[in-house]
Amino acid sequence: MFRKLLGVLAAGIVAGTALAPAAQAADNPYGDPNLVSMFNGTDLSAWTSSKTGLWSAKNGVIHGNGTARGWLYYNKAQVGTFRWIFNVRQVKGNHKPTVLIWGTTDPIRDALSAIQFQPPNGGHWDYRPGHNDGGGKLFTQLPHTTIDIKKWAQCELIGDAATGVARMACCPLTGTAATCKGVEVLRFTDKTAGRTGPLALQVHNSGIQDEYRGLYVESPVVTKPGEFLTL
């Protein structure tokens, strides 16, 4: 067990690494040449899972297999100040989709001791030691029309490690549209929370099958720092 944990840590700790835009980054639908694709559509080589068999690359998406609670984090870099854009939908499940920011892989604890955002409608949780609660006034949920989690939605998270402010904007994708006009749904503020850590997809409990596609990250943030691209 100890050797297995060391292997996970060795594979995943790439702290503070600046991301270089990939050749195909200019092909993203957001007009930002500094966005880097996080998923090649065929395998999970850029990702590290908490458990074997929890996730799979299926039909061009990252598919949660619903086998257990756990996470899948991007292992090419860890980020503090960032822009993260993705599409999400839930195929099956009894809990909203969840993603994690500002966690840590050293040591590895439940949910990476991270701040949880629940796309696309803005639920939340604080997994940091001494917290493990809903976060109270640290989170602000903003009024918006409820987005159907069973259909594809676009979400953008922007985080500033220096200020401890992270925000999420989402919108429903219609038909074959590649993008949509987002609306801010959730804001988190705690100056003590911002840190360099992994960006992760989370399965809250067994039986949940969430899917993700079109994942892009920008760090450091060069294009419109502190502003959403998708609004």
What are these regions (language model features)?
Residues 19-25:
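Sec/Tat signal peptide C-region and signal peptidase I cleavage site
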